Amino acid sequence: STHCISSAASDVYKRQIYEMHHRDFSVDSTSGVKNKGKYLALTEHGTMNSDKLLTGIDHLIELGVTHVHLLPSFDYASVDETRLNENSYNWGYDPQNYNVPDGSYATDPYQPATRVKEFKQMVQALHKAGIRVIMDVVYNHTFNTDESNFERTVPGYFYRQKEDKTLANGSGCGNETASERLMMRKFMVESVLYWIKEYHVDGFRFDLMGIHDIETMNEIRKAVNAVDPTICIYGEGWAAEAPQYPADSLAMKGNIAQIPGVAVFSDELRDGLCGPVGDKRKGAFLAGIPGGEMSIKFGIAGAIEHPQVQCDSVNYTQKPWAKQPVQMISYVSCHDGLCLVDRLKASMPDITPEQLIRLDKLAQTVVFTSQGIPFIYAGEEIMRDKQGVDNSYKSPDAVNAIDWRRKTTNGDVFMYYKRLIDLRKSHPAFRMGDAGQVRKHLEFLPVEGSNLIAFRLKDHANGDHWEDIIVAFNSRPTPARLTIPVGKYTVVCKDGVIDVRGLGIQNGPEVIIPGQSALILYK
């Protein structure tokens, strides 16, 4: 069958997404991969770093993620396929031909069948490993305008123009496509269906989705549902500049309630934790700076209406925008902006190596215990850094490549991420998937002071065999006290260690949360 995947991965609520670029993931000499930076890298089992720790696809299986999000893998213009010996690097947000794999990731770009076959081999290998494949799609603009396939087909039709007939530029890349025009809409729907039917792709991440109109995104969702409703669709609920189209008709974050079955990234949660994206030196909750707490609570609840989330205290929104929690992607970092390690260093110049590890773990614990769909950037699980580069779209491998020696030096961090992913997978309370259930079972607990957030998932939430789960996040450098309902609790996460078998017993009504860490208990 087209999607021979275990039901676990196809369950919307269980999704855990891992975002990667082909070169980043395997090009480094430490990867032990033969087909470095290629589609085929993801078909190689048994690859290891010099300390015999797993890399490549086996690393993904070990980590436990359910979906891999591949940065642009359709044919893009910014890497010359005839000069691959130059090792030039680009993320690939420069569309040339939408419906064919890019040749720079194939072993032979001159043989047309090679890229097709190798892309399919990659998808097949990931499917066999129980991992689904998400494509990053960039229908919002093309690399060229005058020379583009669209402009050559019907000049002036596929792109939006301003009143003065110059090109609109919602993408910030020179043009923006007109998804509301019937033939552009038809092109997008058919392109998505082609990747599903021909290449067995399981999901799509829409770049600058806020440039597309609501109706088109609903049409795409409808067409995809007819093939396989478990295929995921999410995107960036914003644009680079204001698109030339009525704002209330665009697939922006604030309108996502009108696009059921489509999710968007929560910059509220991200920046409530890390600080404003526009000022890398400015921290927030993780840096011990008060004020981000409500934005984080907004994210924990899944961007839905919740009686304890006061939206007037949330950083970027005055109202809940998601109808259902699965319409929110929770994350602290992605390919854009600083990776987590660099962000922590930028906002806390005096941070010690130990604090870096503690806050790194704390950040992802918030992400993976939130009701949205968790998303991590490749390499975060072994504390990758990009030397402080915040827009590495064409930076060399020296900046972008994952150094797999870090799996050895940061083995403890990797184990924490792996156990965090497993905790979420094993416990339905963390992924209720239904707004009514979240309002009923998720209760924020009162705390004293700032830089402390606590909540309870009560009464066997979503059929969880744990009756009550207490989760607390303390970003202060010192221990914090928390009052919890009386009872005998088993500790499963404390002081940077996770073990579902239990780390001891704790009795209410008062518990202590060590500084810069998360505490998770259940009864």
Task: Identify the meaning behind each predicted range.
Residues 2-9, 13:
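Single conserved hydrophobic/aromatic residue that forms the stacking wall/gate
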Residues 16-18, 68, 133-135, 204, ...:
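Hydrophobic faces of well-ordered beta-strands that scaffold small-molecule active sites
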Residues 408-437:
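Catalytic cores of secreted or luminal carbohydrate-active enzymes
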Residues 475-487:
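Surface-exposed beta-strand/loop patches in extracellular or lumenal glycoproteins
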Residues 485-499:
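Solvent-exposed beta-hairpin/edge-strand motifs
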Residues 503-523:
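C-terminal beta-strand-rich structural cap/linker in extracellular carbohydrate-active enzymes
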